[in-house]
């Protein structure tokens, strides 16, 4: 066991040193969140492929939660109005997602959505994406 413990200790020390040298750029992280939402709104939800439709809303919810965490981190560095706009748009998106929730953390299969429902969800995602872009331009 001593060899394994020593190797683990060495690896943890090395990782610790590497983590100290990582620089996270706020604007890049917010840009990544914008890109993530853009992919969902313009590719995933508009794709005619239905074999993964059962998972689309789960993916939208996970992406929304990730964006919320990024916004929490950088909200204090952004213009107050622009940050509030993102929060507002996220609330609308969360309400839209919640409408399709069935039970606890289960969702209606996206393939059952009407065209109008799909458009509403995509619009809510796009609104968050656009608000994030605006917030990102104001990061200090």
Predicted segments with their positions:
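Mature extracytoplasmic or organellar-lumen-exposed domains after removal of signal/transit peptides
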Residues: 1-140
């Amino acid at each position: 066991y001593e060899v394994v413990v020593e190797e683990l200790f060495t690896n943890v020390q090395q990782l610790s040193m590497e983590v100290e040298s990582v620089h996270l750029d706020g604007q890049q992280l917010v840009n990544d969140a914008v890109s993530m939402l853009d992919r969902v709104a313009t590719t995933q939800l508009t794709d005619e492929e239905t074999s993964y439709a059962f998972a689309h809303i789960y993916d939208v919810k996970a992406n929304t939660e990730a964006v919320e965490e990024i916004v929490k981190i950088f909200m204090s560095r952004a213009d107050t109005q622009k940050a509030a706009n993102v929060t507002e748009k996220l609330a609308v998106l969360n309400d839209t997602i919640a409408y399709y929730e069935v039970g606890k953390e289960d969702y209606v299969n996206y393939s059952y959505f009407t065209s109008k429902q799909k458009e509403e969800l995509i619009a809510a995602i796009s609104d968050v994406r656009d608000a994030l872009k605006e917030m990102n331009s104001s990061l200090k």
